[in-house]
Amino acid sequence: MLPPGLESTQMKQTERRILLGRIVGAFGVKGELKLESWTEPRTAIFRYQPWIVRAPSGQESVVSGVRGRDQGKNLIAVFPGVTDRDTVEAMHGTEIYVARSALPPPKPDEYYWVDLEELQVETVEGVKLGTVSHLFSTGSNDVVVVRGDRERMIPFVFPDFVKSVDFDANLIVVDWDPDF
């Protein structure tokens, strides 16, 4: 459940939104929230506002003016108008999104993972491997998970394995053995 006073929203169906984190608990008794952030660095989540928050019930609201700080393994945030622990505990599990348009453009030869999802993947020989399902990081490099006739995990490394990314063609070309 989201607290009263947060503006309800119905996002445009065409506007893509990005999941940046979630509320994982209460901190103290004055309405502060513990957040888990998936941004790099994790405090960058506070730069991208307004947030679209989605409660586990499906209720969505828009929140602006969230302040926060780094605290141990979590971030601590203060939502405008939230001043007690009970309200925060009711928000546990709430997901934090922003509109894709709220993010700055990536640097040349860098990509937001969300922009790569759903792109088609084929080899330099033209063999279709499938569609990007998701990506994950191994620490040393990112890996693109491609779902087609089977699932493949391809290191997202230029120019060794990834030869090109073409958003206009909706295509990633890779140097990859289709039997691997």
Curated annotation (Swiss-Prot):
GO cellular component, as recorded: cytoplasm; ribosome
Domain PRC barrel: 108-180
Keywords: Chaperone, Cytoplasm, Ribosome biogenesis, rRNA processing
A GO BP entry: rRNA processing
Cell compartment(s), UniProt: Cytoplasm
GO molecular function: ribosome binding
Superkingdom of the organism of origin: Bacteria
Family in the record: Belongs to the RimM family.
Domain notes: The PRC barrel domain binds ribosomal protein uS19.
Function (record text): An accessory protein needed during the final step in the assembly of 30S ribosomal subunit, possibly for assembly of the head region. Essential for efficient processing of 16S rRNA. May be needed both before and after RbfA during the maturation of 16S rRNA. It has affinity for free ribosomal 30S subunits but not for 70S ribosomes.
NCBIfam families for this protein: 16S_RimM
Subunit note: Binds ribosomal protein uS19.
Protein's name in the database: Ribosome maturation factor RimM
Organism: Xanthomonas euvesicatoria pv. vesicatoria (strain 85-10) (Xanthomonas campestris pv. vesicatoria)
